[in-house]
Regions:
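Pre-ATPase regulatory/linker segments immediately N-terminal to the P-loop/RecA-like helicase/translocase core
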Residues: 24-173, 223-226, 231, 237-255, ...
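Eukaryotic intrinsically disordered and solvent-exposed regulatory patches
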Residues: 45-48, 67, 76-79, 165-166, ...
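Beta-strand cores of modular interaction/reader domains in eukaryotic scaffold and signaling proteins
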Residues: 52-54, 58-62, 80-82, 90-92, ...
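Walker A/P-loop
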Residues: 174-198
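Pre-Walker A (Motif I) flank of P-loop NTPase domains
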Residues: 174-180, 205-207, 273
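Walker A/P-loop NTP-binding motif
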Residues: 189-204, 220, 224-226, 315-317
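Conserved helicase motor core of SF1/SF2 NTP-dependent helicases
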Residues: 202-206, 214, 266, 280-282, ...
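Conserved helicase NTPase catalytic core signature
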Residues: 210, 218, 222-295, 309
Length: 511
């Protein structure tokens, strides 16, 4: 209902077109502004909720001049949010609109989130790719054969100067796959992945594919690549609006903009030895594997990716039916960021004995978790995986609970200044009980928790007074985007303008 959409910030309406560039050949867009009338929720005029939208979001736009107008009975225009602020929203349209009459200037408009079916389609394609893969690759993924390793590197691995060098050498020694468990703050992307890339890049002609689940994580990979010296050439596959401005020059559309012939496109892609993108964006471009063979694919955030989402890439075929990816490295932490699915454990449990025998016990598990679980059962499989144990993010008192509950006490502090601070009277880990939502309410929002978060934010602001820095003093992490809107609403009610600038986001975005 409209009331529910307003409550969770899933709709913005009563918008007018300020500038219409829908007919532009390149980057057609619309600039929308509030109509000047206060946006109301059906449930309660006083319960204004801030919209739950951000740059890059896929949206649908439609005329909405009455409460009965919605996406099912009006013409829909698809696009993405270019930028938005409290005064205006810029929508980048997916298709140009030469007929100006379809977007009348005197009409009111609404935007809602778009539901994409490409993810489901790519998973079916991934399953087909798996069934069409070579027997050797299928046997590997189903644990029917042991992964192979270059034992000649054992001495170097044993004598490695530090954790990241050891892990990079183990990744190099792997002929099939390698798993890296990276608990929070251990540098799995900024240090471990970077070291792996440096190691593989030294091999003449080695082609590297870097993947992650979210665009924000791909930004972090690009940041790590940009810090490598001497500089390395890389191309990012993805859309402009989902890419940090610092790395847009590396986007494939910009890298190929000067190419006049198909041969030039092929040459540019073949010349670049590192390609980066989300699993979804690479899955959507299977032709890449016909253009070049990747010696290694490194997947960050691998524990967030379900098996069908990743199989299409790991089982992709290149020219002459050869495997598109030589070997793969999975980096993640199933204790910290498991895959997010709607079904509960009972609904996704696997009962087939043959599947259980190869480790497929629950469809909620990622490929990383299944392979890691299988490797742990073999005492001689130490070459298959490793774990980073030195973390530089949390104070030991903050890390204590997670360390004991999930990591068997193996996490050690690096010893950075903030980890050595005396806590004094500070309680670094507190639990606040909240009230559950009424039966039938969304599981992704909780009003009680939003009020608690706002109250604590006000306390932090008052304690820091003039020293409060919205960009550094306080951040609020919440599991779901729908809850972000509720927390922002409660903070807005406080009337403290500085708190409106703090970062409130999901676990994945902070990670």
């Amino acid at each position: 209902t409209l009331a529910e959409k307003c409550e969770s910030g899933e709709i913005i309406y009563d918008l007018r077109i300020k500038e219409n560039h829908a007919a532009d050949e390149h980057k057609s867009h619309l600039l929308l502004v509030p109509s000047g009338e206060l946006q109301r929720t059906v449930a309660d005029d006083a319960q204004h909720t801030l919209p739950n939208f951000r740059q890059g979001d896929a949206i649908v736009l439609y005329e909405r001049n009455a409460d009965t107008d919605n996406v099912t009975n009006k013409m829909v225009f698809k696009g993405n949010i270019d930028y938005l602020n409290e005064n205006e929203i810029c929508i980048r349209l997916r298709a140009t609109q030469q007929n100006s009459s379809v977007l009348p200037s005197d009409s009111l408009y609404a935007i809602e989130h778009d539901a994409m079916d490409t993810t489901f389609r790519s998973m079916y394609q991934g399953l087909y790719a798996f069934m069409s893969a070579t027997k050797e690759r299928r046997d590997l993924l189903l644990s029917q054969r042991e992964p192979q390793f270059d034992v000649a590197l054992d001495k170097q691995i044993a004598e490695a100067a530090d954790d990241f060098t050891r892990i990079a050498l183990k990744a190099k020694a792997a002929k099939d796959y390698f798993l890296l468990v990276g608990p929070p703050g251990t540098g799995k992307t900024s240090c471990a992945l970077k070291k792996m890339v440096e190691t593989f890049y030294k091999e003449e002609g080695a082609q590297i594919l870097l993947l992650s689940y979210t665009n924000r994580a791909v930004d972090e990979i690009c940041k790590a690549l940009s810090s490598i010296r001497p500089e390395v050439d890389f191309i990012r596959v993805g859309s402009e609006l989902s890419c940090d401005e610092n790395y847009r020059d590396h986007l494939i559309e910009n890298e190929l903009a000067t190419c006049m012939r198909r041969t030039e496109v092929r040459e540019r892609i073949n010349r670049c030895r590192i390609l980066v993108g989300t699993v979804a964006s690479i899955s959507g471009k299977p032709e890449l594997f016909r253009l070049k063979h990747f010696d290694v694919a490194i997947v960050d955030e691998a524990t967030q990716i379900l098996e069908p989402q990743l199989l299409g890439i790991l089982c992709a075929k290149g020219e002459n039916g050869k495997e598109g990816v030589g070997k793969f490295i999975l980096i993640g932490d199933h204790k910290q960021l498991p895959a997010v699915v709607l079904q509960n454990t009972e609904q996704s449990e696997v009962y087939d004995e043959a599947l259980s025998a190869v480790g497929l016990k629950n469809l909620k598990d990622s490929l990383f978790e299944r392979l890691y679980r299988t490797a742990r059962q073999h005492t001689d499989a130490h070459r298959t995986y490793d774990m980073l144990c030195r973390q530089g993010r949390m104070h030991p008192e903050v890390a204590l609970f997670a360390n004991q509950a999930f990591y068997e006490g193996r996490l050690l502090p690096v010893g950075l200044p903030h980890q050595l601070e005396d806590s004094g009277n500070i309680n670094r880990l507190s639990f606040y009980p909240s009230q559950p939502e009424p039966m039938g309410s969304s599981a992704k929002t909780n009003h009680s928790e939003a009020k608690i978060a706002a109250r604590l934010a006000a306390t932090v602001y008052k304690e820091h007074s003039e020293a409060f820095d919205a960009s550094r003093t306080l951040g609020i992490i919440t599991p779901y985007r729908s809850q972000i809107a509720l927390i922002k609403k409660e903070i807005e009610v406080l009337g403290i303008s500085e708190l409106n600038q703090i970062l409130i986001d999901t676990v994945e975005r902070f990670q």
